[in-house]
């Protein structure tokens, strides 16, 4: 078991050095992504505003509260916390997320299935497990 300090963007060589039970500390931007976001991206063809190449995404269910729209919160929502959500329901998006957007790491809880493991192996990515309930 080893520990890795990684800074985004991450390259394929860095990811392929990781082994099961290694620990990772990430530095840089982490993008939260949930099932609804990926449905918009892959089923409805919506483009992202961000370049995800070489970055990590976290399977998340953000918690927000409604506020008056303003400069700090133009959408009318303020973030409260970001909690992990179960990765299994996002299984079908792993390969397209890596192929089309260059994502290297997916962080989530509950794990992913064989199709995702094959995608990680084929495309140079990894799944990082996180403890559920860390947003509480």
Question: Predicted regions: what is each one?
Answer:
Residues 32-136:
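Feature captures the catalytic cores and cofactor-binding loops of soluble hydro-lyases/lyases
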């Amino acid at each position: 078991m080893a520990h890795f300090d990684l800074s985004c963007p991450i390259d394929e060589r860095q990811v392929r050095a990781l082994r099961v039970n290694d620990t990772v500390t990430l530095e840089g931007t982490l993008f939260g992504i949930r099932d609804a976001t990926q449905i918009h991206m892959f089923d409805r063809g919506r483009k992202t505003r961000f370049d995800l190449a070489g970055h990590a995404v976290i399977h998340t269910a953000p918690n927000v509260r409604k506020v008056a729209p303003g400069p700090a919160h133009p959408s009318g929502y303020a973030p409260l916390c970001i909690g992990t959500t179960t990765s299994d329901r996002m299984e079908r998006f792993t390969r397209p997320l890596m192929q089309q957007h260059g994502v290297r790491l997916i962080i989530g809880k509950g794990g992913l299935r064989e199709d995702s493991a094959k995608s990680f192996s084929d495309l140079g990515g990894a799944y990082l497990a996180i403890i559920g309930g860390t947003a509480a």
